[in-house]
């Protein structure tokens, strides 16, 4: 990992290098990338590099007639309505907001769309339905982004 991260940085110093997304952390690269499901959490810190959450979330919501396989569906946590799933997303986003003051630098929600048997997406597998309340998601995401400018 360290050798590849150093080679990559030397090859193209203009790009950020993420040496290991989610595990096998070494003192190299431009960031420390953690994975935590379902709720976000910073459990490691590095004084030399920003800490990011490369994966979190996994909020499951099954929407009939928009599934890859109707009888096998999975999410880290399962909800029965868009409101419940959106409430959980907002709860996690509030946690991210509170982590900014502790040095938190970025996050990637898993995942943008449902894939095969995973129903964790913000949209359905067929991309026909946005599963969460777009207005509430946009508002909380903008609140987090704006807090990074302070």
Task: Kindly give the residue locations of the regions a language model identified.
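Active-site neighborhood of glycoside hydrolase catalytic domains
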Residues: 1-31, 48, 91
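Catalytic metal-binding/acid-base residues of hydrolase active sites
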Residues: 13, 22-23, 37, 57-59, ...
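Intrinsically disordered, low-complexity boundary segments flanking structured domains
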Residues: 17-22, 39, 108-111, 127
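Short alpha-helical segments and helix-capping/turn motifs at coil-helix boundaries
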Residues: 18, 37-40, 91-94
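Structural signal for conserved beta-strand scaffold positions within catalytic alpha/beta enzyme cores
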Residues: 19, 33-34, 53, 124
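Short, flexible loop segments at the rims of nucleotide/cofactor-binding pockets, characterized by
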Residues: 29-34, 85-86
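Alpha-helical scaffolding within the catalytic cores
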Residues: 33-47
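Substrate-binding clefts and catalytic carboxylate motifs of secreted carbohydrate-active enzymes
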Residues: 44-150
